[in-house]
Amino acid sequence: SEMCIRDSIWEADRLHEMLGVPVCAYETEAAFAADDKQNGSLLMMYESITCKVHEVFKDGETFRIGEVPVTVLHTPGHTAGGVSYITPDAVFTGDTLMGYSVGRCDLPTGNSAELRESLKKLAALPGNPDICGGHGPVTTLEDEKRRNPYL
């Protein structure tokens, strides 16, 4: 749920081979997966890491994992291509919203104004879904509204 950078794609090809699942990315991020300079692997890991993207998602698109509908919500800020995945009971927010905090915006393509707008989108979601961030505990939307100073 963030851009196709080194820590997000590290094992993607291997998982594709082992499980037969496609590697998917948001429409603006697919190019990062194949470019070790853009995805930061040469800078941070001293090793070229790339992967092939099989499917590209767009904002508002819905797909299924088994019988579960999953809707893509573009939530830029931590990265320009940040997305959250909305299911009936949970929202997978990556580093946009995570355990009473948010992802940093000082890395390439990060933008604090976009992050604020993304947090408004997430706060406006109906109900009280579980929030499954990229780090920290699973929380709920109501908990985040009460305890997260950024929301």
Task: Please describe what each predicted stretch is.
Residues 1, 6-62, 150:
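Active-site HxH/HxHxD metal-binding segment of metal-dependent hydrolases
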Residues 38-42, 62, 69-151:
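Metallo-beta-lactamase
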